[in-house]
Amino acid sequence: MKSAELRQAFLDYFASQGHTKVSSSSLVPANDPTLLFTNAGMNQFKDVFLGRESRDYTRATSSQRCVRAGGKHNDLENVGYTARHHTFFEMLGNFSFGDYFKREAIKFAWEFLTGTLGLPEERLWVTVHVSDDEAADIWLKEMGVSAERFSRLDEDNFWQMGDTGPCGPSSEIFYDHGADVPGGPPGSADEDLDRYIEIWNLVFMQYDRQPDGELQPLPKPSVDTGMGLERIAAVLQGVHSNYEIDLFQALLQAAAKATGCTDLEEKSLRVIADHIRSASFLICDGVIPSNEGRGYVLRRIIRRALRHGHKLGQDKPFFSTLVAALVAEMGEAYPELGREQARIEKALLAEEEQFGRTLAAGMKVLESAIEQLDGRVLPGDVLFNLYDTHGFPPDLTADVARERDLSVDMDGFEAAMAAQRERARGAGSFANDYSDRLNIDAITDFSGYEKLADDNTVVALYKDGAAVDTLNAGEEGMVVLDRTPFYAESGGQVGDTGALIADEARFMVTDTRKRQAAHVHVGKQVSGSLTIGGKVSACVDVDRRLAVMRNHSATHLMHAALRNVLGEHVQQKGSLVSADYLRFDFSHGEAVSEAQREEIEILVNRQILANTAVTTELMDIESAREAGAMALFGEKYDDQVRVLSMGSDGFSKELCGGTHVNRTGDIGLFRITLEASAAAGVRRIEAVTGEHALAVMRRQERALSEIAATVKSSLDNAADRVRSQAQKVRELEKEIERLKQKLASGAGGDLTSEVQDINGVKVLATQIDGADGKTLRVTMDKLKDKLGSAVIVLAAVEGEKVALVAGVTKDLTTKYKAGDLLKFVAEQVDGRGGGRPDMAQGGGNNPAALPGALESVKAWVAE
């Protein structure tokens, strides 16, 4: 049975049993920053199992695409070297949300395996948890499974979502490949060998684990099952390795053709075939190669595949060409793969071209390090150098080491990385900035959402990194209050500035930072003194704060607009929100076009004109996700989060602790000022709002008015007029070039009279007025043809620069080299140059010395 037929048979069987067919979810988990990639069929139903979400069905079935290549579930290093490890796989599953339980789940599984697929019962082995008498009775007494092919196991047969929450026993079904294959049954010492292969896991969620470890029965027990498509396909197709099934054969052949490898058993081909699946589907689902988070895992996968291609002798881009074979194999099951084929190929090719430039050099460094190795462990500093200089992820280096029976010093690598991070922190800090080193016990309440001025108490003072009781006039330091309206730098938003005032004392705040639970006001005591326990009025710079708020709110609107215009793959990669402008880095593989920029601006300004209220709501993190609020992967959120909503019809909803305008109309105006690359796969937009946006538009209008006046046109017709003038300039430049060539041709004829005979050799060394380098080269070719046999040097002067061309006809190159002659002349005019024996060019910076340099050519030939 083909894999596609197997996938369809599974879904059809469970649909016939009252299950709703649910499409595979994205490999990027929706609103779940705790999960790197979708790695199981139940991921998209997690909130249903937890009771946080309800759906209009209680039975579901799916074929879920999954990736395991990072974090807790990481199969990357084993891929290609074992029969069943993959970075990408499909998980067939059936699910019950408080509907059926153990009896039906077991019956469905047994009926599908032995009935629909026709697997012999004597080839199947079943396990249950040691405590699960109910499941054991169903298998042994109702399904008729032989006690000789049945076992009770402990922790291997108990599943839990986390330290607390839903959990329960599981039942696993194994396929026995026969006595001629090494290995023992589940639970034996040899269970990890290849004879008995797990093909299906049935999880019975019947308990809720409490913080104290107690297992309380769930009111609605549920079922979550998973069967790897590739594994069961291998069983049905009579092969022991997943790489031998039909899904991989076309990919292996395409990889072999692309790399020139003829051995389809080659492990590197298996790596490439596996990795084109995971890389393509990840890009399809919006992940872009980068140096952080999901993008970094994708980059590691791609670079590992490229390294194996290089190992097979392929040093040109090849990986992106395999996408077509993948689409042909899986495009029918996943139509989105075909729709995104061009984008996937483009992203892979860009990564190949970028890494290809350093792969060969990095491999030379690694090979050299291995040759010089004294022992069997590759040092951590070698791994660090390869990563830092050549972009080699450490697991790629470990992959090479593994092939040579070497191990790697990962602890040494981590130590080198930590040292680099420490150096970076030191380099990025001001000499007198001690705030990073402070350990502050105080807790500051933030009142800045409601107030821009507040009366507070000083609870801590610091000078030169040390706690003090008093700050006096003229001293720089840091002040901690019990409560403050000053926003501390966080989430890309800059810290507030302003003043702390008490009677005659004034402390000017130049920055506000968060250290532990305290807000640290950084600045200078300009008059009077502050003491611990003293009262102050904390006054935020209102105009600056309002400008920051406009830019922060505009950032949210722009983020939503980017996802609307460019696609759901857009994810925030970094941001800066200041009073003057906003900067936003996001995942996207190509430049944003002018038309797209305009559409983004229109969408944002439309929301500004709508002048809708900006609302914030405090809720727990799970409720926020359920409400559709965007969460950033890798961010750590408190149990209670602020959900910020703005724009009409739910235009933008994100988790955010920053300060924002009350209504979108308060932003005033939005204008993009820059769009550029920030890193591979990451674009950057800078924009301004309010009066800054108006100032930008006024400057642009003034510039346009000046251009229109220069070309004698109205503003509306200025662009057409400039295009017309530019075309005329191009035509005139062509005419000038034509006249130069004509001049050179005429000059070439005139110059023959200057030829001198030096020891039987025709020699010409002269300056041509008004010529450039190209004219000199054309003239040289004409003179060589005309003279037949000669040594020639031509020069031209433009300003303070000298252009030189030397030529020697073919018959004289054994004795005279144009490169040597050019170097001889160029050095005399403070320049340099070089070239072939028959033609060389260069220049200099001393026109005054040119006559003497040309005169010396005759002596050079005569030597």
Swiss-Prot record:
Keyword Magnesium in record: no
The record ties this protein, via CDD domains, to: AlaRS_core
The alphabetical list of record keywords is: Aminoacyl-tRNA synthetase, ATP-binding, Cytoplasm, Ligase, Metal-binding, Nucleotide-binding, Protein biosynthesis, RNA-binding, tRNA-binding, Zinc
Q: From the record, give the transmembrane residue ranges.
A: none
The record's Gene3D superfamilies line, in alphabetical order, gives: 2.40.30.130, 3.10.310.40, 3.30.54.20, 6.10.250.550, Bira Bifunctional Protein, Domain 2, Threonyl-trna Synthetase, Chain A, domain 2
Predominant location of this chain? cytoplasm
Under SUPFAM superfamilies, the record lists: Class II aaRS and biotin synthetases, Putative anticodon-binding domain of alanyl-tRNA synthetase (AlaRS), ThrRS/AlaRS common domain, Translation proteins
Q: Which GO terms describe its molecular function?
A: alanine-tRNA ligase activity; aminoacyl-tRNA deacylase activity; ATP binding; tRNA binding; zinc ion binding
| Reactions it catalyzes | tRNA(Ala) + L-alanine + ATP = L-alanyl-tRNA(Ala) + AMP + diphosphate
The record's annotation in InterPro entries points to: aa-tRNA-synth_II/BPL/LPL, Ala-tRNA-lgiase_IIc, Ala-tRNA-ligase_IIc_anticod-bd, Ala-tRNA-synth_IIc_core, Ala-tRNA-synth_IIc_N, Ala-tRNA_ligase, Ala_tRNA_ligase_euk/bac, DHHA1_dom
What are the recorded Gene Ontology BP terms?
alanyl-tRNA aminoacylation; negative regulation of DNA-templated transcription
Q: In the record's cofactor note, how is the cofactor described as bound?
A: Binds 1 zinc ion per subunit.
* Positions with a binding annotation for Zn(2+): H552, H556, C656, H660
Superkingdom field: Bacteria
Which cofactors are reported in the record for this sequence?
Answer: Zn(2+)
Recorded E.C. number(s)? 6.1.1.7
Q: GO CC annotations?
A: cytosol
Known NCBIfam families for this protein?
alaS
- Record's domain comment? Consists of three domains; the N-terminal catalytic domain, the editing domain and the C-terminal C-Ala domain. The editing domain removes incorrectly charged amino acids, while the C-Ala domain, along with tRNA(Ala), serves as a bridge to cooperatively bring together the editing and aminoacylation centers thus stimulating deacylation of misacylated tRNAs.
Briefly, what is this protein's role? Catalyzes the attachment of alanine to tRNA(Ala) in a two-step reaction: alanine is first activated by ATP to form Ala-AMP and then transferred to the acceptor end of tRNA(Ala). Also edits incorrectly charged Ser-tRNA(Ala) and Gly-tRNA(Ala) via its editing domain.
Under PANTHER family, the record lists: ALANINE--TRNA LIGASE, CYTOPLASMIC (PTHR11777:SF9), ALANYL-TRNA SYNTHETASE (PTHR11777)
Similarity annotation: Belongs to the class-II aminoacyl-tRNA synthetase family.
**Name of the protein in question:** Alanine--tRNA ligase
Q: Which organism is it from?
A: Alcanivorax borkumensis (strain ATCC 700651 / DSM 11573 / NCIMB 13689 / SK2)
